[in-house]
Amino acid sequence: MAKIIKYDEEARQGMLEGLDELANTVKVTLGPRGRNVVLDKTYGAPTITNDGVSIAKEIDLEDPYARIGAELVKEVAKKTDDVAGDGTTTATVLAQSLVHEGLRNVTAGSNPIALRRGIEKASDAIVERLLSNAKPVETKEQIAATATISAGDPEVGDKIAEALDKVGQDGVVTVEDNNKFGLDLEFTEGMRFDKGYISPYFVTNADEQTAVLEDPYILLTSGKVSSQQDIVHIAELVMKSGKPLLIVAEDVDGEALPTLVLNKIRGTFNTVAVKAPGFGDRRKAMLQDMAILTGAQVVSDELGLKLDSIDDTVFGHASKVIVSKDETTIVSGAGSKEDVAARVAQIRSEIEDSDSDYDREKLQERLAKLAGGVAVIKVGAATEVEAKERKHRIEDAVRNAKAAIEEGLLPGGGVALVQAAADVQKNVKLEGDEATGAGIVFRAIEAPLKQIAQNAGFSGEVVIDKVRTLPAGSGLNAATGEYEDLLSAGVTDPVKVTRSALQNAASIAGLFLTTEAVVANKPEPPAPAAAPNPDMGY
């Protein structure tokens, strides 16, 4: 494909147009009085949202240079969302303000490289101050307050606080559709995975169509169970104790399945067979998780273990196992706490090292099943559009609350940035264009607070001047229009969200200012209209 190239000021202005189009669309959503944006969809109903990254993803501009500028800002929103789960609009507003301030100085003759260094040094200093100003999350009410701000709904904030209080920081909170109106919260006790019994003949509770095993043996194998001889040997081991048996295997088929079913029907011994969850290496890892949780040993060819020669030391134990058509829950596994803690530490390390969002999500689920638990928030609404929008807001609020637990809280409403910058400005000692770069940050840092004020119907400049005279931690509560102690009022932002927004915005601003040429794809001319078909004249 042919390329077109622009240089210097012309290149930067082309990109700036795209940045402004995207940022001006996104920033109307900022703050408690922010507006919604309607996103048209090729198929299905339109989406109504106030989530910055969702809006940014939908914007695709026609001009190639504007498109490149918009894509750079999309990266700011996406990266902030990936790291913190919120703060995408704040990051976009900061990036726009930093770029405008910076380009003004580049046009006036400042050195872009020195400006970039100044921006980075000032941003790093402000981030350090934000971290030192952080207040740890100590109460359920603090979690509820920060989740309420993110979701814009007190009921959602309370449900998320209850969920995280129950499952812990390592637990997983998932959001699902509900077939009735409103919010419901459900908790999973023990380790649950999405595989049910292989045969309905294993059911012990006909009313609920579940199989419940009390104090069972648990046999885990990475291979298939197909041979009748294997089942006979396993049955001999189990029948001595009189305990029920759960078999988790790649599959149970051949002669093995009818043998198990026949023994169950005759009452010889109570057993349930289920397929192991996952595929490939992930299946092996999940089986090992189960083994550690229950004190079992995975029967595997790799370890030289065969089903026809095992003894009862390979069995795991749990207080109860509940198996339905679609899922299995292991309650109170008998594994060593030390072994479980070591496995949890290993999975945490894998999460930190992983660069794949999908892998991190799956590892987090495994971690929750071992260390925490799983809470499910079920969302129902009057229309599909409303349910989809509410579900998305709740997912963001969950990540926001977890970010608060991780690094602590700051006063919200853009105040923490303004006050941290004022403290840092007194101590930053830079010269020349680096000092100019730092000044760009100290001016641009006001943009989120100004935008929140404007969206709430106040003058941004007046609010900034007022906040500068207030004690640390006090500012405008845009929801009520009052100036007050924001931490006490429950108007907070997670440190992780605020610092990620600033760091990512500063990074993209530096790239903008140091761009000297832009190479874009040349737009293809529209295809000529098809010639009329003479046979269509009838």
UniProtKB/Swiss-Prot annotation:
Keywords tagged on the record: ATP-binding, Chaperone, Cytoplasm, Isomerase, Nucleotide-binding
Single GO molecular function: ATP binding
User: Pfam families, per this entry?
Assistant: Cpn60_TCP1
**Primary localization class, coarse:** cytoplasm
- EC class of this enzyme? isomerase
Q: Where does it reside?
A: Cytoplasm
Described by its record, this protein's role is as follows: Together with its co-chaperonin GroES, plays an essential role in assisting protein folding. The GroEL-GroES system forms a nano-cage that allows encapsulation of the non-native substrate proteins and provides a physical environment optimized to promote and accelerate protein folding.
Describe its partners and assembly state: Forms a cylinder of 14 subunits composed of two heptameric rings stacked back-to-back. Interacts with the co-chaperonin GroES.
The protein, known as? Chaperonin GroEL
